[in-house]
Amino acid sequence: MAIDEKTGFLGVTGDQAQIASEEDHDPILNNGSTPDAAGLIQSVSLRSGYGQLKSAATAAFFGINHRGAGNPIPLNTDQYGLTFFTRPRLNLSYDNITRDRTLAPMMSMRRDSIPRAIRAYLDPVGARLGNPFGGPAGVAVAGAASTTAYPSTLVDDQSAFISVLTNNLVSMTGWPDPYTDTYTSKSGLYKEEWTMIDGIAKIYNKFSLSTNFRNIVGDPISYLFYVWTQYASLVHEGVLDPRPEMVIENEIDYQTRIYRLILDPTRTYVQKMAACGVAFPLSISIGASFNYSDDKTFNADNDQVSVEFQAMGAIYMDPILIKEFNDTVVMFNQAMHDSTRRSTYIKLESVYKPLFNYIGYPRIDPFTMELEWWVSKGDFQTIMGDTGLLGDTVRPLSK
């Protein structure tokens, strides 16, 4: 160190100044690489038998790794993604639920109560005044039932899915693997045999899905499945009646469809998709909540709710699932139809999605497999205004 003659302050010596100057011009320190770094890396990769790193995936498809030098392609890193449960169509009208005492709590007049929310989830028709494809809840339309609607402030009447199940699903197991039967001939003199495919690889049989849900405050999931299973049993017994249109069309009203969407690491694109034909809950671990032990204050057995579903048919990687998923969304919210969606909703760009978590309606682009989220223009203006980003131009917005 030396004293600067002009300022009188300590400064660097000539040697130190030279070192600092060299550091300022060091491309590795400033840019993280040298101008020919890419070429050097490529040369090392080629000499080692790995091929060009930037085209490793292409090379694996095109040719044979005859040097056995290893494969630099990264492993698949798909996320578990999302699981959607479509809403069934139970008949939880006043005349029905008054026939069984265990269903009576759903007569609650409080729109923010859990029993009222369960009633709205499981009976979307009644929650919208008998109009499954109509306007806002509580607004009568031509031909709609004259009974009083029972919407809930905790349930989006225009959503086709049971959100509380999607948001609290911990695990799901039991999806079957495709399997093909074979025929094998009788053995010959030298025990020679021949074999061939002798069956179908499609999955049309029944199977069980085991699910576990996080038991959140108020225990709404246990009550939801309790009502669901009790209703199905009481309909079979003849105590409760399905809606007339379900009887006429010979449909089962307590069934749901489970969609499984495997997403990429950014949760932007659907990598794989599956669904069962239909499913319905069979059992629920409600008994565990009544276990007792004086060793602990809180019942740890009730941390999760276990539910077994009976499913029929498994559909994997079928493009028709994209259309059926989108059609299901439109069935509950006609404004999401391709002809009207852009006049009512705004597609969220990735940079804005965290602001609108828990808000919006999904759509899968059939060409790019992007999982889009659309929010109403009113919600968009409100939330962007509340966060001070209304005039944000970070990215152009889809209109």
Please give the residue ranges for each predicted region.
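Glycine-rich, low-complexity intrinsically disordered segments
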Residues: 2-399
